């Protein structure tokens, strides 16, 4: 199978760098074909702007959505964007690996999403009607593909627990897993999380690579997170709110997981 690893850390000799190399070796050892988008090494341009289209802005002002739509539809995107889209088409699974910085992904990775997820490619896809509101949240260009996060953080696991000061890690990652991955159609696997990264020794690193290796081995067999499909009957259309009989006692992010 084909696996794309999108990696965001500025230091090749970091823990993240070592784990990235381990994941690539493990995947290749089990017969998978791997491509790596090392965003810092690529000097990836993180800001979405009019230069993402070979035609520049279409009117007097730059319109991020409409200019993106025009560039994608007419083959006028900048080469770096088109290249990453080709990698996504090629991949059967995508891994996003990054350190948790200020409760989200590094800006360079967010910029990868913003620029590569063009109108007509990752959003603005499918019909809109009284029963179907676009191909998204379980449908879309990435449907049938898998995705997983590998995330490191310096905080303790308890800090990210149900009553932890930072908030539950599933809530922190929800905009990424549900919004950036499930939205265009990926089946999203539970993330692999590494806490207290400053407290690392040889024995702990060995345990982590053993666990991570098992997760990588199960990339195409593990059960995905049970996010509710937008167009499968759980949501009222076009309001896109859960119907009254669906998870009536729940609200917030948890309500959108079956």
Q: What name fits each language-model region?
A:
Residues 37-44, 186-203:
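Short connector loops at secondary-structure junctions
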Residues 119-124, 157, 186-190:
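Short, structured loop/turn "capping" segments at alpha-beta junctions
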Residues 124-182:
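Short, glycine-/small-residue-rich phosphate/pyrophosphate-handling segment
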Residues 1-125, 210-258:
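N-terminal beta1-alpha1-beta2 submodule of the flavodoxin-like/Rossmannoid cofactor-binding fold
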Residues 174, 179-190, 194, 218:
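Oxidoreductase and adenylate-handling cofactor-binding alpha/beta cores
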Residues 89, 107, 142, 186-187:
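Structured loop/turn residues at beta-strand edges in well-structured enzyme cores
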Residues 46-51, 160-162, 203-205:
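Short aromatic-enriched loop/helix-cap "lid" or pocket-rim segments at secondary-structure transitions
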